[in-house]
Every structure is written in C-alpha cells, then in structure tokens.
C-alpha cells in the first residue's frame, strides 16, 4: 500500500451540497416562461451539464434556442437559485476529518466555475480545498472527463493515488476515463444502478475516510 495519502476530488451538486431546490425551482420558472409543458420529473436534471438537458427539452430546437434556454436558466440561478442550497449533513465534519488526516482536497464540477466558487464561499468551505475546477465557458463545452483530466494534470496528481467522490454516473465515467478510482456518494441524487459502477459506495459522509483508508 502506498504511503502517499490519496488526493480526494469531490463533485459539488449532490455530493457536498443539496442544490436540488434551487435548480428545480429555476428550471420550473424558465420552462413555464418557454411554455415547455410536461417535462417530467425535474430532479433528473440535477447533476448533468446544462447543455445536456437543453437538448432533451428542445429536441427540435436550434443550437441558438438551446443557448438561450441555458442563458435564461443561468440568469435565474444567478439571481436566486444558487442560494437555495444547503450543505449535506455530515459533510463539514467529513471534510474537517479528511483535512486533519492530510488528504489534499479538490472540487471538480460541471457547474460554471463562478457559481461553484460563490456557493463554496457562501458556506465557508473554500478554504478547505486546494483548488476548485468548474466550467468557464458561457455555454459549457467541457465534459466532466475533460475537467477532471485538467485538474489531475495541472495539479500533478497520480491516478494511482487519487479518488473521485461523486453521486452521479458522470462522476464515475469521468473517473474511469481518467483511470482513477471512484467512491459513490450514496447520500446524493444517484440511483443504485449508477452507484453499482463505482469502485466503492459510501452510504454517508462519515463513511468516506474509512473507505479510502481501507482501499
């Protein structure tokens, strides 16, 4: 077993914070304004990149229409949605424990960089992380795979001693594509089918340190 403490890379939505209320409220308002009827359960849009669900919601729309829909959503999220959010129970304690042990901690999210930074600042979590990676494009063009690859490369992390911790299949697939292990955050928004594809499953934030140590 390596004596190097693993670097731990956390997803944001559904892993560190419960962002569903703010996301779904803004989605509901924007879809009403666009007269998009019966979109189905909105919670399925928590986690995937905005650009992915604009295609689903506007299957016959133009790229310009999808960009405008994304902009309208983000305008609502910028005004009010980002604050309609909370830190999951046990996450602060988990981060404090991992930091005390000495694990380097990072955030990698498909959310736009400035939103991620604002949310972490709101909850006074920024100081716990070495770096925060989100998308910087207005209409995001980077996949979670690419964002994670950039983080690993720019911080000279070794895939053998790095974990991705997230709640959705996008986190698991990004970890697999970058040849790092993934710990599923079982308290988040993912399904049992998604969690089954991870290397390990943490039922609560309190389980993370022990699972990483035992790996």
Protein language model regions, located:
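Asp-based, Mg2+/Mn2+-dependent phosphohydrolase catalytic module
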Residues: 1-5, 39, 96-99, 113, ...
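Catalytic-core regions built around general acid/base machinery
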Residues: 90-102
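N-terminal helical cap/lid subdomain that shapes the substrate entry/recognition surface
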Residues: 2-93, 114
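Conserved phosphate-coupling serine/threonine residues in phosphotransfer and NTP-handling enzymes
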Residues: 109-111
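Conserved hydrophobic beta-strand within the GNAT/NAT acetyltransferase core sheet
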Residues: 105-107, 164
């Amino acid at each position: 077993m390596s004596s190097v403490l693993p670097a731990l890379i956390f997803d944001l939505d559904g892993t560190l914070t419960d962002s569903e209320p703010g996301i779904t409220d803004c989605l509901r308002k924007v879809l009403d304004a666009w007269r998009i009827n019966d979109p189905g359960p909105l919670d399925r849009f928590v986690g995937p990149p905005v650009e992915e669900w604009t295609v689903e919601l506007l299957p016959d729309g133009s790229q310009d229409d999808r960009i405008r829909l994304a902009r309208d959503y983000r305008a609502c999220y910028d005004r009010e949605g980002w604050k309609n959010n909370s830190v999951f129970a046990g996450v602060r304690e988990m981060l404090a424990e991992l930091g005390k042990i000495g694990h380097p901690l990072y955030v990698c999210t498909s959310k736009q960089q400035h939103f991620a930074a604002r949310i972490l600042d709101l909850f006074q979590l920024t100081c716990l992380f070495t770096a925060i990676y989100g998308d910087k494009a207005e209409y995001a063009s980077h996949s979670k795979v690419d964002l994670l690859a950039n983080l690993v490369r720019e911080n000279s992390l070794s895939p053998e001693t790095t974990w991705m911790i997230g709640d959705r299949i996008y986190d698991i697939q990004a970890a697999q594509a970058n040849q790092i292990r993934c710990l599923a955050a079982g308290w988040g928004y993912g399904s049992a089918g998604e969690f089954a594809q991870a290397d390990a499953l943490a039922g609560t934030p309190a389980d993370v340190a022990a699972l990483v140590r035992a790996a």
